[in-house]
Amino acid sequence: LYVKDLITGEVIDTKIKNTSGGSAWSTNSKNFFYVYKNPTTLRSEKIFRHDTDFPHSEDPLVFHEKDETFSISVSESKSLEYIFINSYSTLTSEVRFIKSDEPLSEFQLIQKRTTGLEYSVNQFEDHFYIVNNKDNSFNCKISKVSITDPSYKNWVDIMEHRESVLIEDLNIFKDYWVVTEREQGLTKLRVQSWDGSENYFIPVEGETYDIYTGLNPSFNTIKLRYGFTSLKTPSSVLEFDMLDQNNKLLKQTDVLDNNLGREQYSEIGVVAV
């Protein structure tokens, strides 16, 4: 990792070696957290806090994942109000958090690791929104909990588990939340407003396709960027206005003419045996 002053263009810190490349900044633009990767095992196992006023050799260790079956990452909430340390193994996860404007505080545990319990955390206002498989929810569900006491005994489901629908992802925005769902092999993007007045899927064309959310770092926006491709549509990047429900094509891959018209493609279902 390198630290660069964006105003002067000066690199103000020498490279920090053996990191995963991920980092999360506090709101003071002075402290950030980064992940140390063991150079032998390549396991992400430690989180350090850096202060740009001091050499990185003095960075304090804030978390050490000692269980060799787990790796870790550090991330920010979409609102930039919270910083998370995520511990995860094949079937189990665990998340800690602090407020971004309190970088020297101790990370608090949301829910201690329990074998088989997987969860990921988003934040909106004074609640965490958690995609999880609690109570044998193998397709996952979404729960809500107050930040003041976020242990799973207080989780309240806001999107129930469904046996035929897999919840894959959750994106949080100021006015909307977007759920990536998969049903019968096809992905759908569900858009819901926080006030409950809107609940709809982004419209798509075609019998078979692939749709996915792209990088959407902005919290205060009504625009969702996503990718789409199908047998009839080349790989495309689109921007969807969640208020007006209009699509705007930003980029599309050029495809050479193969003398096959789009109407010549169709989906055929086959029963597995």
Task: Give the positions of each predicted feature.
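Asp-box/WD-like beta-propeller blade repeats and closely related beta-sheet repeat scaffolds
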Residues: 2-41, 45-48, 57-64
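Beta-strand C-termini and the immediately following turn/loop, strongest in propeller blades
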Residues: 33-41, 51, 84-90, 98-100, ...
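Generic long, charged, amphipathic alpha-helical segments
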Residues: 152-173
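Non-catalytic accessory segments flanking enzyme active sites
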Residues: 71-123, 169, 189, 196-273
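Surface loop/turn motifs at the tips and blade-to-blade linkers of beta-strand repeat domains
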Residues: 14-18, 63-67, 110-114, 158-163, ...
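Short loop/turn segments that connect beta-strands within beta-propeller blades
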Residues: 5-9, 51-55, 99-103, 146-150, ...
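Extended catalytic-interface subdomain
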Residues: 34, 42-98
